[in-house]
Regions:
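Short beta-strand elements
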Residues: 18-24, 282, 386-389
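Basic, amphipathic alpha-helical bundle interface domains used for macromolecular binding and assembly
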Residues: 37-45, 58-60, 67-77, 288-289, ...
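Peripheral, non-AAA+ core regions of ATP-driven protein-machinery
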Residues: 1-217, 224-227, 330, 469-470, ...
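Conserved inter-motif catalytic segment of the P-loop NTP-binding fold
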Residues: 244-278, 285-286, 392, 432-440, ...
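Short loop/turn elements that form and flank the Walker-type P-loop nucleotide-binding site
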Residues: 59-62, 99-100, 132, 150, ...
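Walker A/P-loop
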Residues: 218-259, 324
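Walker B catalytic acidic pair
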Residues: 299, 305-306, 317
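Conserved alpha-helical scaffold flanking the Walker A/P-loop in AAA+ ATPase domains
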Residues: 207, 264, 269, 279-302, ...
Length: 509
């Protein structure tokens, strides 16, 4: 007898519906699993048979063939255990075929028949709805994640025996309901700019970066607060939209980083990989590519501390995600494109010992050592970073002042207002910040007053700007004007943008 159920796997950050076709026929007893299964799926036939037996269900010894279609897609999800088991029971006539139509099954089975959670439930739920399926059977720990998508009846199934009783009408399971949990209000941040005394220029630069989605390089001596500033960047970014939150949750679900009963991710990611991270860890990879750090930081902040300590190869692969806001990973089995709309915040010392240019410490590095150190970061990579700032030690009086510094909430209010102006301006392009503008958009939306043009032209020749640097300065100036509520870019806006590009002394341009 033939039966068909639906399972799912993931490809990139999207779900893929898998037709599970089961045929039971007379002949030599056996269990064949075909359709390009990966190792974890090949092992499922042993888990399924043992789970069925330990659930108190006896099957006749016949020839079983399971086909996972489409056959040209590699299946690598242990979540196919449940649809294979249900399909097998349906082919034996133990479960009505009508009861499994229009339903997606996705859970790993333990040997005693219990349902275990898997990664990637959210993209599977989205794909199920797109394919017109109406019911989704998952492990209890995956219930909240599946409920993020409207239009599906989600059933949290404890074990295979319970599911069989439900499908045969012996027991009725009620659809899972969202748990009434309080969403965290991120108005009160753990890391707040109010804790940072002094460093006014650096805080201003990060505000501009947050408002326009610009990348930032912070150069300073040890103890000047580079890391402290960077870790507060997320606190001044606008709240996530529902679409952004779902996209981030999909990525974390695929990566297995979504905690139990986490539900929707509501805070912007902040990723800070160690400088020993490999290229694969940074951009993603594997035989079937999985997201790397640039994708895990999507719609958030990627912080690279001690930038020159990263391998040159790892740094150079950042060019594509910074420029295109996506990264393409090619492997023998698949070529996938992952999103990477990030704000890069990089920090570094000015020299190997860290004290070049410091008033209180003598730098022990030779000119050659400093040159080799700064050359670890290529010109093309630095050219893609919009804002370059240098920070010095915090003044004693700033450290001991009784006046509280401006809070993240106050800075964020200005950032949100500037972002709204950009959203309205760029809505026809489906863009949301100035950093995403291309050259034609810059010409259309970035009108410079005559004196501002004069300042830009002088800077272009004086500091030998590249065409890319020229455009990035204009985009930063447009953001500064948006923070001021100005329609045109004035001289003061372009002057500040130029200062934020050329004030770190690394001979970048």
């Amino acid at each position: 007898m033939f039966a068909k159920t639906y399972g799912a796997t993931t490809l990139g950050i999207d779900g893929r519906i898998i037709d599970v076709e089961v045929d039971v026929s007379p002949g030599l007893p056996g269990f064949e699993l075909v359709g390009l299964p990966d190792t974890s799926v090949k092992e499922s036939k042993e888990r399924v048979r043992t789970a069925i037996r330990n659930s108190g269900i006896q099957l006749r010894q016949e020839r079983v063939t399971v086909n996972l279609a489409p056959a040209d897609v590699r299946k690598d999800s242990s979540g196919l255990d449940l649809p294979i088991a249900v399909g097998l029971l349906a082919s034996y006539g133990m479960v009505p075929e009508a009861a499994v139509q229009g339903a997606l099954f996705s859970a790993e089975l333990s040997l005693d028949g219990n349902c275990r959670p898997i990664s990637g439930i959210l993209p599977m739920a989205i794909t199920a709805r797109e394919h017109g399926l109406t019911e989704f059977y998952v492990a209890p720990s995956n219930g909240d994640e599946a409920l993020l998508i409207d239009g599906l009846k989600v059933y949290a199934v404890e074990n295979l025996a319970q599911l069989v009783r439900h499908l045969t009408g012996v027991e009725t399971l009620s659809p899972a309901m969202p748990q009434a949990t309080e969403q965290k209000k991120d108005a009160a941040f753990t890391d707040d700019f109010a804790d940072v005394q002094g460093q006014y220029q650096a805080k201003r630069a990060l505000e501009i970066a947050a408002a326009g989605g610009h990348n930032v390089l912070v150069v300073g001596v040890p103890g000047s607060g580079k890391t402290m500033l960077a870790r507060r960047m997320s606190s001044i970014l606008p709240e996530l939209t529902k679409e952004e939150a779902i996209e981030i949750t999909k990525i974390y679900s695929i990566s297995g980083l979504l905690g139990k009963d986490t539900g929707l991710v509501t805070t912007r990611p902040f990723r800070s990989p160690h400088h020993t991270s490999s290229t694969v860890a940074m951009i993603g990879g594997g035989s079937i590519p999985r997201p790397g750090e640039v994708t895990l930081a999507h719609h958030g902040v990627l912080f690279l501390d001690e930038l020159p300590e990263f391998s040159k190869k790892t740094l150079e692969v950042l060019r594509e995600p910074i420029e295109d806001r996506q990264i393409t990973v090619s492997r023998a089995n698949a070529t996938l494109t992952f999103p990477s709309s990030i704000i890069l915040v990089a920090a570094m010392n000015p020299c190997p010992c860290g004290y070049y240019g410091d008033k209180n410490h003598v730098c022990e590095c030779s000119a050659g050592e400093i040159k080799r150190y700064t050359r670890k970061i290529s010109g093309p990579l630095l050219d893609r970073i919009d804002i370059h700032i240098r920070v010095s030690r915090v003044d004693y009086n700033d450290l001991h002042t009784t006046q509280r510094a401006e809070s993240s909430a106050a800075i964020r209010a200005r950032v949100v207002a500037a972002r709204e102006a950009q959203r309205v301006r760029l809505k026809s392009y489906d863009l949301f910040c100035n950093a995403q503008m291309n050259h034609s958009m810059i010409k259309k939306y970035c009108r410079l007053q005559s004196d501002a043009e004069g300042i830009l032209e002088a800077a272009f020749h004086r500091i030998n700007l590249s065409a890319r640097s020229h455009d990035r300065i204009i985009k930063v100036a447009r953001t500064i004007a948006d923070l001021d509520g100005a329609q045109e870019i004035a001289a003061k806006h372009i002057a500040e943008a130029i200062q934020l590009r050329s004030d770190i002394g690394l001979n970048i341009d």
